[in-house]
Amino acid sequence: RFRQHILQQIERINTGQQVERRHKKYLSRQLTRTGNMIAFDKMLEDLYREEPRQATEYLSQLGGVIVYLTIRYGRKDRIEAAYFPYIIKKYRLIENRPFSGVVDAMYTLLREASIYCRENAMQALYTTGDCDCIMKALKILDGGESFFHEKLLADGLLEFTGDHEALGRCIEKSFADFSPEMQVAMMSFLRL
């Protein structure tokens, strides 16, 4: 079902047209169901193998849909809420264009008790390539009441898609503002 809808939009992209508004509305309705999101994910995997440039362009035109779905998934139970940041990370939906609504929703998930929500939100945020975004996320995690393992954080920082040296400078500049536990994770990143 998704395949036919998406392939029609890919054909539009191939002819220099935009993704249709009615398609965006269709996705906004259908993808609020986690089962449909899983099917959409599988369809996107195929599309990326077959036509990576068109798949990237297609997703880049879905900004409003992504913001809407971020809000909707944020209201779901924690396991379902954790799934959407995974999709954001997997397809780098906020890479070099951090939609403030999506990034703000990821910050909200960092405050959740669920480690899945927090880890997937951080993974999504690493794809922004934005040092300020990561520093804010680190401060949220550090100020939270839930434990976030330093190894997860140190390894995650290596996934940052932006300039690692610039991130290192930001971390060094604010190092003293963080708890000893957070400093350990930061030191692991800085050593690499």
Residue ranges of predicted features:
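Structured extramembrane domains adjacent to transmembrane segments
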Residues: 65-105, 114-123
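Structural detector for internal amphipathic alpha-helices that build alpha-solenoid repeat scaffolds
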Residues: 42-46, 50-60, 82-94, 119-128, ...
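Membrane-embedded alpha-helical core segments of multi-pass
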Residues: 78, 129-130
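N-terminal topogenic membrane-targeting module
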Residues: 1-75
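Alpha-solenoid HEAT/Armadillo repeat architecture
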Residues: 74, 111, 126, 142-143, ...
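Short inter-helical turns and helix N-cap capping residues of alpha-solenoid HEAT/ARM repeat scaffolds
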Residues: 76-77, 113-115, 144-150, 178-179
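Amphipathic alpha-helical scaffolding segments comprising HEAT/armadillo-like alpha-solenoid repeats
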Residues: 24-31, 60-73, 96-110, 131-142, ...
